């Protein structure tokens, strides 16, 4: 298993790096050049920089990921593609994407886009909380322990 992180706006990178390096599982952070950093990463953690295009990180992750790899993303489109490839996919708020829930998530995203296109406003996501982070940590540790 390898871990790929859609890292541009991922609030749990620290959890992923800490838990994965302790378990000696390689991590690849995929992020745009606009988030460039000179920060030294622990052994086993690689950062790949991509152009700032809308889906550049998603495309790169899909090029790299193989069946049974673990992907962390908040992007439903990437999650859908990764599930079809046989990957395990987690959201940073601590839930697992599945073939059973991805259709509803994509449909909700589509309907919200149509509402916004018509000029109306939609509610954004709830703020990320410490409880969300702990929920993610518990789920992540259970997945990498398998």
Swiss-Prot record:
Family: Belongs to the UPF0178 family.
Pfam families hit by this protein: DUF188 (PF02639)
Protein name in the entry: UPF0178 protein BcerKBAB4_2842
NCBIfam families assigned: PRK00124.1
Domain of life: Bacteria
């Amino acid at each position: 298993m390898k871990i790929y992180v859609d890292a541009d706006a991922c609030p749990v990178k620290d959890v992923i790096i800490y838990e994965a390096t302790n378990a000696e599982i390689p991590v690849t952070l995929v992020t745009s050049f606009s988030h460039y950093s000179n920060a030294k990463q622990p052994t086993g953690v690689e950062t790949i920089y991509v152009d700032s295009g809308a889906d550049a990180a998603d495309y790169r992750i899909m090029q790299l990921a193989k069946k049974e790899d673990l992907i962390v993303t908040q992007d439903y489109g990437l999650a859908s593609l990764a599930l079809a490839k046989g990957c395990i996919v987690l959201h940073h708020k601590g839930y697992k994407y599945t073939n059973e829930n991805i259709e509803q998530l994509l449909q909700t995203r589509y309907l919200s886009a149509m509402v916004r296109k018509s000029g109306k406003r939609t509610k954004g996501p709830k703020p990320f909380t410490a409880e969300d982070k702990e929920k993610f940590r518990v789920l992540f540790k259970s997945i990498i322990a398998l």
